[in-house]
């Protein structure tokens, strides 16, 4: 019975919050709120604006390093090593490889905004 009460209270509460979130913004409607947010771009202009290639390259580099850190850094702890020295050595090697990649990008001027 307690499980049923908790479930029904959660359903009623979430339904009320959804309805409030749906109807409350419609009470105070103005032009800026009705327009979609376009990440700093003017939504009335053309969609074919030129895109900065330097920004694109820095963004791709950030995504690559971010994914490498997110996916590879937990690896030494995930493979259940018994020796802490081996685990720390593996983590140090992974971070060193990432640091070398970052240094290579820096030397190749891949992180600079100037043309």
Curated annotation (Swiss-Prot):
It comes from the Eukaryota. It is found in: Mitochondrion inner membrane. It catalyses: a ubiquinone + NADH + 5 H(+)(in) = a ubiquinol + NAD(+) + 4 H(+)(out). GO terms for molecular function: NADH dehydrogenase (ubiquinone) activity. Its EC number is 7.1.1.2. Pfam families: Oxidored_q4. Core subunit of respiratory chain NADH dehydrogenase (Complex I) which is composed of 45 different subunits. Interacts with TMEM186. Interacts with TMEM242. This is NADH-ubiquinone oxidoreductase chain 3. It comes from Osgoodomys banderanus.
